[in-house]
Structures are given as C-alpha cells and as structure tokens.
C-alpha cells in the first residue's frame, strides 16, 4: 500500500483495513501487526511513502498487487519508478484518488491518456448505498454555498484553487459557446496567438480567435523554433488571420528573426510579458491607474482576459448587458477545450513589492506540480491591451 508521502504508519490505511478485517470476522486469518498485516496463506500487506522510499521500492520483488491511495498527490517521478517495478505475472496497480487538477500527472496518466489494459471508473456518492443523511445535507449546502468545491468533493471533478485563481473555473464554464447563448457572432479581427516552447518538455501553442470568439487551439512539441514559426505562419494564412502575436522574449527571439524573413502576408507583433504596462495613465478602476494596478503587461493582459470571462459569466447567468467586444466565448468544438479550461484556471494572482498585481511565475507553478500554461498564454496574447506596432519596431 503506497501513497506519495507517509511520515508514519498512522498516515497509512492500515487502521482502515484492520477495521474491515474485524467487521468481516477475519481475525483468525489475518495477523494485524504494528506496521504490516500478514495472512495465513503467506500474503503480506506493507505500507510506505513513495517520495521518501523510492530507492528501496525499486529493488522490491514479489509484489503482485499495489494499492496507491490518495493518488492525486503522486508525482510523475514516483510513477515512472513504481510502474516498472511491479512486474510479476498478473500483477496489477489499483489507484484511488479524488482528482484535484486536470493537469496532475495521475489524472493525465490514467484518465486523460490511459494506457492499454487500464480501466478507469468514476465512483461517487450515488454509488454508496450507505451514504449518510448528514453528508447528504452537507452536500446540498455545499452545492449552494461553493459550487466549485461541491464538484470536487462530491462529484469527483478536478477543479482549480478557486479562491486564488485569476480566472475562476465557474466563469470559464459559462463562457463555453457564450456567443450562441447570448446571440453574438464572431466578428472583428482574426488573430493567432503563438506561445513558443521553452526548453525541456514544454509545448508550443496557437490560439485562433475571431473577435470575441475563440475558435480553436493547437498544441505540439515536435520541431525547433523555425519549424514552429513556419507552422504558425501557415496556420495563420489558412485561418485568414489579420495578425500573429508571439512571445518575443527568450526562445521567442529566434521566432522574431525568422518572421522578419518571411513574406509579409499578414501583420506580426511581438509580446514581451515582462514589458511595461500599456496605457499607464489610463484608469483601470476609478481612482487607480493601470500603472498603479499592474506590475507588467502580462498581469494587465491576464486581467483583461479575466474581465472578459467575468462579464460573460454575469451576462449568461444573470442577464447583465455588456458590449460584445467586452465578452468572450470558447467554442465547444475546440478539441483541447478541457485542457484549455484547466490551464486558464491554474495561474494564481500574486503581487509585487509595491502591491501591484502580477501573475504567479512558471517557477512557482512548477513547485505546485503545474506545467506551463502554453495554450492559456497563447490566448492571453490575443486579447492583450497592447498598442499596435510593426515587426520592425520589436
């Protein structure tokens, strides 16, 4: 029996198993000891934390059944070592977890991209014949009080840290096909946002928007910077885009140089996430200018997208009226829609030393086990409140 972190035997499920053994009157068969359970047929239940015992686990033999409890916390590194270790004929790994984050390795590995011979089963309160009245009452209250928390606790759905998220998950849900719900159409500029992959396992991403409607998202890993720039340019031409906006710092510098060499069939602009705030003297809210509210253009751009999602949520749910160009709609036809929704809701709000809003760094997100939000960043660029400039000015 494994879990990612087990500081003591009391953190394990040994007591739960002992209670079941007693309830089923199996004490004569199982010897429940302090740190293990031994059966008369030679079976043995052992308990360990993966993170602190991963080296010794690699050398374990004779294990034919593994139960990983609280699997949502298990890291990619732990899975990559544990799975090849369980190699007895007919062996199996059973994982039980309540998913926190659609981007977590456990959820991606076994639910989104399950391997062959993997069976994934969603088990909720409806499947529990002993679900108590007290929990039913708590569930109904939570559904009214905090719908996002209810979805996670009682429906087993991965959700964001709603209180800290820049863009709340519930706002994003209401934005799906909002143009159909509210009766507006895709009109205005066609833009392609291009987030360039950093080193390692990072991905490239394109966002395709037409006015206030997000029509498609593409993500890929293969190819170098030049290949990715060419792919983006070809996709933009096919989309009949008016503008490509790309991440122009770091690896993106190579993209800038390559775009300058391409035929000027459409406008191209760079986006410097750490750059100065646009329209610094303009008031964001009464009494507070943009330069007093945001630490950089990245924060300002995420907030601009946040405002679109919030207004769309208010318009769809409560009937509030806003101009179409202040709203946003995510087409339900986007293949990567669920992943995009997760990425949009993961970055947390942060603040600089002067109290201005900034976006949680990718380094801090990585500490939480959250990969770089490439698709979300590509979309943010499409709605960034930047002043138009030519590629030659970058």
Curated annotation (Swiss-Prot):
* InterPro entries, per database record: P-loop_NTPase (IPR027417), Phage_terminase_lsu (IPR006437), Terminase_L_C (IPR035413), Terminase_L_N (IPR035412), Viral_DNA_packaging_terminase (IPR052380)
Q: Tell me the Gene3D superfamilies matching this sequence.
A: 3.30.420.240, P-loop containing nucleotide triphosphate hydrolases (3.40.50.300)
- The superkingdom of the source organism is Bacteria
Q: Which Pfam families match?
A: Terminase_3 (PF04466), Terminase_3C (PF17288)
Q: What is the name attached to this protein's record?
A: Uncharacterized protein HI_1410
Species of provenance: Haemophilus influenzae (strain ATCC 51907 / DSM 11121 / KW20 / Rd)
């Amino acid at each position: 029996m494994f879990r990612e972190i087990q500081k003591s035997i009391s953190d394990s499920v040994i007591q739960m198993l002992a209670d079941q053994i007693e309830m089923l009157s199996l004490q004569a068969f199982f010897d429940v000891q302090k740190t293990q359970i031994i059966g008369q047929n030679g079976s043995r239940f052992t308990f360990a934390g993966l993170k602190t015992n991963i080296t010794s686990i690699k050398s374990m033999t004779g294990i034919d059944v593994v139960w990983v409890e609280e699997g949502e916390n298990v890291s990619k590194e732990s899975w990559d070592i544990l799975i090849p270790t369980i190699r007895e004929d007919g062996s199996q790994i059973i994982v039980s977890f309540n998913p926190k984050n659609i981007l977590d390795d456990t959820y991606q590995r076994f639910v989104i991209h399950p391997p062959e011979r993997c069976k994934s089963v969603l088990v909720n309160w409806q499947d529990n014949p002993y679900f108590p009245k007290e929990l039913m009452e708590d569930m109904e209250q939570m559904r009214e009080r905090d719908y996002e928390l209810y979805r996670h606790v009682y429906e087993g759905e991965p959700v964001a840290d709603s209180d800290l998220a820049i863009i709340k998950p519930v706002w994003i849900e209401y934005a799906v096909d909002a143009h159909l719900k509210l009766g507006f159409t895709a009109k205005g500029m066609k833009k392609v946002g291009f987030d360039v992959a950093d080193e390692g396992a990072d991905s490239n991403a394109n966002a395709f928007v037409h006015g206030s409607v997000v029509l498609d998202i593409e993500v890929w890993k293969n190819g170098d910077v030049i290949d990715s720039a060419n792919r983006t340019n070809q996709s933009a031409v096919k989309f009949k885009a008016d503008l490509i906006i790309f991440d122009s710092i770091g690896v993106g510098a190579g993209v800038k140089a390559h775009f300058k060499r391409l035929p000027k069939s459409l406008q191209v602009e760079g986006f410097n996430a750490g750059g100065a705030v646009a329209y610094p003297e303009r008031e964001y809210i009464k009494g507070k200018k943009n330069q007093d509210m945001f630490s950089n253009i990245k924060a300002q751009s995420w907030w601009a997208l946040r405002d679109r999602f919030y207004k769309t949520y208010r318009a769809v749910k409560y009937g509030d009226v806003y101009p179409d160009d202040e709203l946003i709609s995510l087409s339900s036809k986007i293949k990567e829609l669920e992943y995009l929704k997760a990425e949009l809701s993961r970055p947390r709000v942060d603040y600089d030393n002067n109290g201005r809003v900034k976006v949680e760094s990718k380094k801090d997100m990585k500490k939480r086990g959250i990969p770089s939000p490439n698709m979300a960043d590509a979309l943010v660029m499409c709605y960034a409140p930047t002043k138009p400039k030519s590629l030659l000015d970058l």
